[in-house]
Every structure is written in C-alpha cells, then in structure tokens.
Amino acid sequence: MRAFDQGLGRSLWFVGGVDPECITSAILRFPKSRRNDLWSGIGLACTYTGGGDSGEVRELRRASGAHWPHIAQGAVFAAGARHRAGNMVSQTELGCQLLCGLSAQQAADLCEETLRDVPYVSETTEPDYEAWRRLIRAYIQLGEDLSENLPVNSGRSVQPQVAQRTVALSNRKEA
C-alpha cells in the first residue's frame, strides 16, 4: 500500500494542476496513516517534473506541515534520479531548495550516500527501500552539514556510526 500511495501522490501533482490548495484538499480526504507516503510522491513529482513556480512550491512545502520530511524525501529521490540520468534541470534545483533546503547536487549526493548506508541500518524487518527513505528523512530533519558529511563524488559512505545515530533519532515515532 505504501508504494501505491507514493504513486498516488505523484499523480496528485498532475491531477491537482500544480495547485497547492487542490492537492492539500485531496490529501486531507485520506486517512492520516496514508498521508506521509502521499506527500513523498508529491515531492518527487514536483521536483522531478516541475511545473510550479517558486510561490506554488513554497506554498506546497508550507501546506505539508508536519509531513515536510516526507515531501523533502521525495525531492531528494527526484534529484537522485535526475543526477543518475545526467539530466538536472532548473525545476529540480527549485524543488530541492524550497522543499528540503538543499541544492539539487546536495540532494542527489544525499540520495546516493544514504543508499550506501542502508546495510548498516536495515537490521529490522523493514524493507531496505523504507530504511533508505527513513535515513533521508532523518538527515533532512537533523540538518546535517552536507558540505562536510557528503562531499561530491567522494566515493566513500557516511560513517556507519553517523548512520546508526541518525537512525536511532529517526526511530522516534514519525508523524
């Protein structure tokens, strides 16, 4: 159901016509337990495909409220996908800056670095994909200094101790 809701969130970006009020209204019709994944999908669609101006993206971030780490995680995934495709565009930069407070390159680096750390944190029954998403949200929430912890093309992973500390903090019940 979670992956379905992430896809549904992506579709809301298009169906809602890039209108934050329409998108928020649609999300509020769903049970609270599904909203995190919906916001994640919206963050990915907004950042990957664009279509919104800075005011609309800011309003979307504001409207996400307590779900902001999820919309930010979606933006990080979008930056990672654009980076891997060698196809960074201005809308990806805009989405990353406004939804998660990172440049598109920092977000792409975060996406790659946290993926490398999944083996250090996936000691639960949680699927690796969900551990990866959780790590991204944790880094965003902690406001790690990416210039020190995630150097561009460093070829090295974040220290396992840092990943474990981040996961310990992220294990606190998420909204």
Model-derived features: where do they sit?
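Mature, well-folded catalytic/scaffold domains that follow N-terminal targeting or propeptide regions
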Residues: 1-175
